[in-house]
């Protein structure tokens, strides 16, 4: 067997399939582009769904890729097994209606066994097949020459993820030999069983059926091939590594952790788990941040935060007690740089994000320790012997506190932990995550009609909004028709069209179609599978027929406003990078006639000063009257110019470059103004955060910007009129009013305090004594909870002692507060427990600390009864 590095294995795979006529697709970013069904790109096929369901026809039906992927459905096993990972690479080859089972099997066998490529011993290879897939069995037996004892039938070998393409699959296994298992009585010791001897290295999926919505299976119009080979597993075999972690993909990271920790790998199982967790998780986090994800409390950001915190917790096993994960980023970048330069190119930014998150987590751990101390203290004060599962889970989930650490502290205080309760909380979280998580979601049922419409249609709308053309196809209800009449809708493909199809964030053009016999409106334009512009129309008059000569007219006003917003979007993109940093990447956009919306990655908030600067930069470029130059050129030449490419987009060899002078250079297929002066004016309407590490700016240009400014000016004039001042002096007038209001509030609070003090004399007079404990339980007049707290403060100041419960009616609600003196707490009384009982008797709930609690109720009529219960409760405590 050859000795190969991981980079060499990856490159050999891609070179092999390139030699076999495949287009090598670039690895897509981990954050899905226009696919809300998944949190992460989690396989090679996840980026190919549009080809498999026929919604897009690829230029070459043969494709291959090395796709970085993230899966997080089994995080707790990472580090504890030989091959669980959250980040991994999937090597795959794909055929869309080209070669099928024979081609896939022959290619796989040649790559694995030929001395030119991997050069495995054929006797070491086994395959599994679906029992009913006689064709695959025959090919393995007769075409490849495998003996029957190397072909294993397994019922699960059928790939089906719901509606859409599905079919049998065939997996290839490598026999690592008796050293990894030779117990003949082991029922799992076979290719496809749970064992370490037979490692699955490649899965060949034969998509030959449509899984229909009614549950039936019908043959696909075009059969497809989808294969997946895990690079980490493949490399572990080639490098003769016991687990994936001893390969050159992980060991440099582990060696760096050894240096930081001063602890050696391979001497302790507990330590080795920590090394593996750290090595796995830093790869995931570094690549995910590089691709635009950021730690947060939701979605993919929550997963990153969880992985970072898990790694930091395991680092404590290695006596690492300070931020360190950020130091591993350059190592990850160096390992992967030959194929994935993005981590090395963004090392500083990725390190900054990780270090900030680590520092916050170390602070959070300290907060968690303070919370735990409170929990332990409360448990002792209330004579509880067990720390509740809900408390353990909160410490674990919110503060990253390991259960074992909580247990150690509990034991030090003579307490036990509720493991069953904790596991129940964990199960609930897993169930929530499972319901929210999506793997490769089902695709659309593969269609045939549009995929078979191959006659080309040219877009001629860059320089013209009117054009005379010919109707090539008319489609109604997924059927080709000869004509469509007034009152009906249809889809149309023309020989040439000036109508822009929605793409790159720019909305589709609208307009009219006129023939000698009919009139129709264009409502929408999208790309058909074979890249023609597909127009959705509604026929208003007469009849349109296939072959008709028609006059196509784009709505010029809407197009004019749209292109202003599109060029302004390019200016804004460049201005964001200049103002906030080069880490800013486009995460989505909308360019319509009335506004533009731009989503982008950014770690942190944007200040008012930065927004002002952005507006100034864009408007300066507008007023400089810069010519917009658009040309097509080879992609290599565009890159030399420094052209910005959209993150996650795929480009051909020839690209369209939009240059706004030397200021902004982007690859773009959209329509633009000829000169920035055409934009007129640019105004930012809003800036918000829309998710973890993603911000959104909405803006307007031209007439809409003028309208926006006018509305703002009118609002200011109205405010000035109400304040009886000028627009210029309005801010000072508002400041004066705010100062006056603060003074009134201070006087009001002082008055309320005096009233509460005066009322306290009556409220606190003659408290009831029950078994030597002073008890006050009364209804009072208090406008809110703040005033009730003032009564409690007065009670404390007067050092009355004992137990206080006060209730006040506020509209249809009840406010309740209770307080217990230090002596009463020592005697076993608890304000929170008392108030919970009182609140339930007037339709509410609540609780709090032993010394003070507050609650609310929904039944004012029962407040008197609830307060009467206080005496009963005190007597019950004394019984």
From Swiss-Prot:
<keyword id="KW-0694">RNA-binding</keyword>
<feature type="binding site">
    <location>
        <position position="668"/>
    </location>
    <ligand>
        <name>Zn(2+)</name>
    </ligand>
</feature>
<dbReference type="InterPro" id="IPR009000">
    <property type="entry name" value="Transl_B-barrel_sf"/>
</dbReference>
<keyword id="KW-0963">Cytoplasm</keyword>
<dbReference type="GO" id="GO:0016740">
    <property type="term" value="F:transferase activity"/>
</dbReference>
<dbReference type="InterPro" id="IPR002318">
    <property type="entry name" value="Ala-tRNA-lgiase_IIc"/>
</dbReference>
<feature type="binding site">
    <location>
        <position position="570"/>
    </location>
    <ligand>
        <name>Zn(2+)</name>
    </ligand>
</feature>
<dbReference type="Pfam" id="PF01411">
    <property type="entry name" value="tRNA-synt_2c"/>
</dbReference>
<protein>
    <recommendedName>
        <fullName>Alanine--tRNA ligase</fullName>
        <ecNumber>6.1.1.7</ecNumber>
    </recommendedName>
</protein>
<dbReference type="InterPro" id="IPR050058">
    <property type="entry name" value="Ala-tRNA_ligase"/>
</dbReference>
<dbReference type="InterPro" id="IPR018164">
    <property type="entry name" value="Ala-tRNA-synth_IIc_N"/>
</dbReference>
<dbReference type="GO" id="GO:0008270">
    <property type="term" value="F:zinc ion binding"/>
</dbReference>
<dbReference type="Pfam" id="PF02272">
    <property type="entry name" value="DHHA1"/>
</dbReference>
<keyword id="KW-0030">Aminoacyl-tRNA synthetase</keyword>
<keyword id="KW-0479">Metal-binding</keyword>
<dbReference type="InterPro" id="IPR018162">
    <property type="entry name" value="Ala-tRNA-ligase_IIc_anticod-bd"/>
</dbReference>
<dbReference type="GO" id="GO:0005524">
    <property type="term" value="F:ATP binding"/>
</dbReference>
<dbReference type="GO" id="GO:0004813">
    <property type="term" value="F:alanine-tRNA ligase activity"/>
</dbReference>
<dbReference type="GO" id="GO:0000049">
    <property type="term" value="F:tRNA binding"/>
</dbReference>
<keyword id="KW-0547">Nucleotide-binding</keyword>
<comment type="similarity">
    <text>Belongs to the class-II aminoacyl-tRNA synthetase family.</text>
</comment>
<keyword id="KW-0820">tRNA-binding</keyword>
<dbReference type="GO" id="GO:0006419">
    <property type="term" value="P:alanyl-tRNA aminoacylation"/>
</dbReference>
<feature type="binding site">
    <location>
        <position position="672"/>
    </location>
    <ligand>
        <name>Zn(2+)</name>
    </ligand>
</feature>
<dbReference type="InterPro" id="IPR012947">
    <property type="entry name" value="tRNA_SAD"/>
</dbReference>
<dbReference type="InterPro" id="IPR045864">
    <property type="entry name" value="aa-tRNA-synth_II/BPL/LPL"/>
</dbReference>
<dbReference type="InterPro" id="IPR018165">
    <property type="entry name" value="Ala-tRNA-synth_IIc_core"/>
</dbReference>
<feature type="binding site">
    <location>
        <position position="566"/>
    </location>
    <ligand>
        <name>Zn(2+)</name>
    </ligand>
</feature>
<dbReference type="InterPro" id="IPR003156">
    <property type="entry name" value="DHHA1_dom"/>
</dbReference>
<dbReference type="Pfam" id="PF07973">
    <property type="entry name" value="tRNA_SAD"/>
</dbReference>
<dbReference type="GO" id="GO:0005829">
    <property type="term" value="C:cytosol"/>
</dbReference>
<comment type="function">
    <text>Catalyzes the attachment of alanine to tRNA(Ala) in a two-step reaction: alanine is first activated by ATP to form Ala-AMP and then transferred to the acceptor end of tRNA(Ala). Also edits incorrectly charged Ser-tRNA(Ala) and Gly-tRNA(Ala) via its editing domain.</text>
</comment>
<dbReference type="GO" id="GO:0140096">
    <property type="term" value="F:catalytic activity, acting on a protein"/>
</dbReference>
<dbReference type="InterPro" id="IPR023033">
    <property type="entry name" value="Ala_tRNA_ligase_euk/bac"/>
</dbReference>
<dbReference type="InterPro" id="IPR018163">
    <property type="entry name" value="Thr/Ala-tRNA-synth_IIc_edit"/>
</dbReference>
<keyword id="KW-0862">Zinc</keyword>
<keyword id="KW-0067">ATP-binding</keyword>
<dbReference type="GO" id="GO:0002161">
    <property type="term" value="F:aminoacyl-tRNA deacylase activity"/>
</dbReference>
<keyword id="KW-0436">Ligase</keyword>
<keyword id="KW-0648">Protein biosynthesis</keyword>
